[in-house]
Regions:
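Membrane-embedded alpha-helical segments and adjacent helix-loop junctions characteristic
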Residues: 1-88
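Juxtamembrane and boundary regions of transmembrane helices in multi-pass small-molecule transporters
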Residues: 65-69, 84-163
Length: 163
């Protein structure tokens, strides 16, 4: 009944959740994101790439897509959209719709790039281990880095073409 608590993966997820809450509460994630947006945010494409870089930096340490995307990236994206006077309705296409789609898709890419970027990834590694396949953080990263970087480069441009 309590055998699940003996699984190290469950404890890794629990501790990472506590750390992600600390990053949100202290505002560290927000400061990291605003740093990258400030460096690259001269145009809307730069803002999207800045948000992507911020997500790459905080992604390995926050194993929850909802905590990272909804707790850190979304409020920043919303503030940027407000600064461009982009609100739901007729002005949504000014910045808000583009940023909302780009940030949510970027968060999905980050979840696949790092073993610790999503709570389910360590469970996948544990399942693979039970079948005799060892997946370490580095093997996951090396397998996902090239498609992840290509996706992060292409995605904002593709979304920009649509909007």
């Amino acid at each position: 009944m309590l055998s699940g608590f003996a699984n190290g993966t469950i404890w890794l997820i629990a501790i990472a959740m506590f750390l992600s809450r600390a990053v949100i509460k202290t505002g560290l994630g927000k400061r990291i994101a605003l740093y990258f947006v400030g460096r690259f945010g001269k145009k809307m494409m730069g803002v999207a790439y800045g948000m992507a870089l911020a997500d790459v930096v905080i992604g390995p340490g926050i194993p929850s897509a909802s905590a990272r995307g909804g707790g850190i990236m979304y409020p920043i994206m919303q503030s940027i959209a407000d600064a461009y006077e982009s609100k739901p309705g007729p002005t949504a296409r000014r910045a808000g719709a583009f940023l909302a789609i780009a940030v949510s898709q970027i968060d999905t890419i980050i979840c696949t790039m790092f073993l610790t970027a999503m709570a389910g990834n360590p469970l996948i590694a544990e399942l693979a281990k039970s079948q005799g396949v060892e997946i370490t953080w580095m093997t996951w990263f090396l397998g996902a880095i090239v498609p992840g970087i290509v996706s992060l480069i292409v995605l904002p441009y593709f979304v920009y073409l649509i909007y």
